[in-house]
Structure formats: C-alpha cells, structure tokens
C-alpha cells in the first residue's frame, strides 16, 4: 500500500513539474520573454542591478547597461556638477558609443548619448 501511495505521488509530481527538457513553463517564459541569454555580456557585476550588460543588444552595443558606477574615463563629467548626484540616472550608460553628460543638467534622464564613441 505504501508503495502504491509513493508511486501515485511520484507520477503526480512529474505531471505537476514537467522535465527540464520540455523547456520553461509559460509563466517563466512570459516573465523572461525580453531577456536575451545570448547577450554579449549578460548579467555581470560591474554596477547596480548587476551591470555589464542587461541585454546589451537592446541598446546596440557590446557593453550594454554598465550600471551606475562611473567609469574612469567618465569621471571628468560625472563629478563636475557637484559630485556624484547622478547616481539615479543613466549617465554611465555605454552602448556602442557611450554616455557623456558634457551638457547635462541635474535632471534624472538619459543625457547626450554619443553613438560615435566617447
């Protein structure tokens, strides 16, 4: 009797949780439908939100979303307007070119995207 109960429980578990080879569930697919696992860098660790490329292909660049940490070549801009007050902005976004804020104000918005390189 115990074996029968265990067998039924095993079959029920297999039906409730499909095998990995069947692919992710529809709910999982919906939640991650915009995530590109083939992105150049993927989820790295260079900055907030994990940094080195949250689907960089979305921004047409190998580096993608670098995070909010200023990069060495950007500090001349990031620190000119009263210190690190742009931490809630996309100042350090780097697509195929880069983000500078030479002409930026203090509003929290995308600033001066330069697609030609920095």
Curated annotation (Swiss-Prot):
Residue ranges of the region described as Disordered: 63-118
One GO molecular-function entry: toxin activity
Species per Swiss-Prot/TrEMBL record: Gemmula speciosa (Splendid gem-turris)
Keyword entries, A-Z: Neurotoxin, Secreted, Signal, Toxin
Transcription regulation found in the keyword field: no
Further remarks about this protein from its record: The mature peptide contains only 1 cysteine.
Tissue specificity: Expressed by the venom duct.
Name of the featured protein: Turripeptide NCR-01
GO cellular component terms listed in the entry, alphabetical order: extracellular region
Annotated Polar residues bias: 85-102
Compartment(s) where it occurs, according to its Swiss-Prot or TrEMBL record: Secreted
First and last residue of the signal peptide: 1-16
Top-rank taxon: Eukaryota
Chief location bin: secreted
């Amino acid at each position: 009797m115990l074996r029968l109960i265990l067998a039924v429980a095993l079959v029920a578990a297999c039906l409730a949780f499909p095998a990995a080879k069947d692919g992710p569930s529809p709910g999982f697919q919906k939640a991650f439908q915009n995530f590109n696992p083939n992105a150049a860098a993927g989820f790295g660790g260079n900055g907030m939100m994990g940094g080195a490329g949250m689907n960089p292909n979305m921004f047409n660049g190998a580096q993608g979303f670098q995070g909010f940490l200023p990069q060495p070549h950007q500090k001349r801009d990031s620190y000119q307007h009263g210190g690190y007050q742009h931490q809630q902005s996309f100042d350090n976004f780097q697509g195929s070119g880069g983000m500078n804020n030479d002409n930026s104000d203090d509003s929290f918005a995308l600033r001066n995207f330069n697609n030609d390189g920095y």
